[in-house]
Curated annotation (Swiss-Prot):
Quaternary structure and interacting proteins, as annotated: Part of the 50S ribosomal subunit.
Keywords carried by this UniProt record: Ribonucleoprotein, Ribosomal protein, RNA-binding, rRNA-binding, tRNA-binding
Compositional bias segments (type: Basic residues): 1-13
Organism: Burkholderia mallei (strain ATCC 23344)
Single GO MF annotation: tRNA binding
GO biological process terms on file: translation
UniProt-listed HAMAP family: Ribosomal_uL16
Stretch list, region Disordered: 1-20
UniProt similarity note: Belongs to the universal ribosomal protein uL16 family.
Keyword Coiled coil part of the UniProt annotation: no
Annotated gene: rplP
CC terms in the record's Gene Ontology section: cytosolic large ribosomal subunit
Primary role: Binds 23S rRNA and is also seen to make contacts with the A and possibly P site tRNAs.
UniProt name for this protein: Large ribosomal subunit protein uL16
Length: 138
């Protein structure tokens, strides 16, 4: 699963996920893309589950790019532990997603195969997404 190799600090504050994606919002590598319409967090497990769904559908053809990386640690306290005594330990990593962010890209397959693969992947994600085709000259 995806997670940072090293971090300057183990824990991070919660923060707020506001605004729209101004970077990483266009199809850059492949011919087709899966773009976020909604806002939220994607865990490393969700990113991997969607990748597997796409890979299984396109079989041996095509190439997939993952355009997001889970670099924010989410800490949790164990079950049935009283409040206080400091912040919990990092349990998993998430990627904060703004509307307009390109999540995955694909190339080397037909449009209908890519559309179906992205539909299967989108079912694994907690965000609303849309299918994008690269525009000529863009």
């Amino acid at each position: 699963m995806l997670q940072p190799k090293r971090r300057k600090y183990r824990k991070e504050q919660k923060g707020r996920n506001t605004g729209i994606a101004t970077r990483g919002n266009a199809v850059s590598f492949g011919e087709f893309g899966l773009k976020a319409v909604g806002r939220g967090r994607l865990t490393a497990r969700q990113i991997e589950a969607a990748r597997r769904a796409m890979t299984r559908h396109i079989k041996r053809g095509g190439r997939i790019w993952i355009r997001i990386f889970p670099d924010k640690p989410i800490s949790q306290k164990p079950a049935e532990v009283r409040m206080g005594n400091g912040k919990g330990n990092p349990e998993y990593y998430v990627a904060e997603i703004q509307p307009g962010k390109m999540l995955y890209e694909m190339d080397g397959v037909s449009e209908e195969l890519a559309r179906e693969a992205f539909r299967l992947a989108a079912a694994k994600l907690p965000l609303k997404t849309t299918f994008i085709v690269r525009q000529l000259g863009a």
